[in-house]
Amino acid sequence: MSYEAVPAENSAFIPDQAKRNIKGWYFYCFSSEPFIVSAVSTYVPLLLEQFGRINGVKLDDHSLRCEVNDDKCVLPMFNGRWFIDTSSFALYTFSLSVLFQTLLVISVSGIVDKCQSIAFKKRVLLFFGTVGALATWFIGTLRSDQYYVLPLLAIVGNCSYGVINVVGNSLLPVFVGFLVGNEDQLEVDIKTSIISGRGASYGYFSALIVQLFSILLVKQSKNHDNLQIAILFVGLWWLLWQIPIAFLLQDIPRDTDQEQHEFTWANTGNYMEYGWNSLWESLKHARLLKDVVIFLIGWFIISDSLTTINSTAILFAKTELKMTAINLITLSIITMVMAMLGAVYIPHLLSERLRLPLQQVLIIIIIWSSVIPLYGMTGFVFQNIGLKHKFEMYILGVWYGVSLGGLAAVSRSLFSLLVPRGKESTFFSLFSVTDKGSSILGPLLIGLITDKTHNIRYAFYLLFLFLVVSLPVFHGLDVERGKREARQLSTM
């Protein structure tokens, strides 16, 4: 982008508006992050299981209604043609929502890449943000017998979040570019890292506030276990805190020689085709880089496992350990805080202090993470340990949070070393699709296992297997070779 061509009379306007745009971007993080951290990760899976149990029947006698404290219940679907475990109901819904989200995100990415207008992207953010917030709000108003509507609203909310996530990520480099002007690439990278980090911090801080308020709201409810009021609060938070985006985000005069694409409904098909073609181009580029392929295979495996550990552990704690909604929200807060600390201190301790290469740091984090499903498996052998008590879940919440935060920080840093300069957007979109794609498979497989055994503890075997299999994959990664290949491709 050329900044010399910007008219002189707008020179004072550009940095001021750039700062306003970045403030608007912070509000995007602040408003939407509680949905994914609180609602998707904790509240919605628990509510799905709860609705399944309320409308379910006993496993050993389908003529008897399921009682709240019954251990094994199944939910009759489609007039009793299909009976699924109440935990599987939540897992299948999550898997399906990520599938639709992935398809929608790939399709929308073409529109985002082609239509660079900030005003247009603002409208997309506000539209899908409003749809997602209202879907979340309506979940909080459902009757317990509306168990077909609940997964539909969960899918709509998750798909909406996926779209605004893509649009929000695409706006950050544009805003930073206007802010730094003609400064060198190093300055751009530093500013991007700082602003991105602040946005993530605001998002996590927002999620923490929502979680704390949720505990108070659930405590004040009649049965002290009303998750719907917490979900309704998340929807209200998302809806209200996105309002400043409408006033802060605004177009900035660009180089008049730069080709502009204005969105038209007539070209929607072409935009969607462009999104899928871009994914295909990313795959073709990735095939030229052996270590990128190795990394993405390994990432598919560990991302699948660690994402699924969260939903599995939450459902396990509710169905097997009988933990209350307040217990589980507290567990979620502990995990989130430890993830924030892990993201900061794990790279600092292992990479900077101990001078370990990022590849080894990642392998250490995987081994650390594998302790979680391994400990769950010991419950088949021992009577008093192996996730038999509530306090064990809190300890594993700390353990899991550290591993999750460390993995998020290290994985992106390691992958960035393997990416050719100038093609970052292409390869990180592939990274994102790999991440989302893995989240389809894990919950689906765990759901099938739980449906077959009606014991969600068996899921820990599969999760442990995933983590162990990823170790030789990442051991085969050659970072120096990957850097050389990336440099060669960047000159092509």
From Swiss-Prot:
The chain crosses the membrane at residues 27-47, 92-112, 124-144, 161-181, 199-219, 229-249, 292-312, 326-346, 362-382, 391-411, 430-450, 459-479. Its main location: membrane. Keywords: Amino-acid transport, Autophagy, Glycoprotein, Membrane, Transmembrane, Transmembrane helix, Transport, Vacuole. Pfam families: ATG22. GO terms for cellular component: vacuolar membrane. It is found in: Vacuole membrane. The keyword Phosphoprotein does not apply. InterPro entries: Atg22, Atg22-like, ATG22/LtaA_families, MFS_dom, MFS_trans_sf. Belongs to the ATG22 family. This is Autophagy-related protein 22.
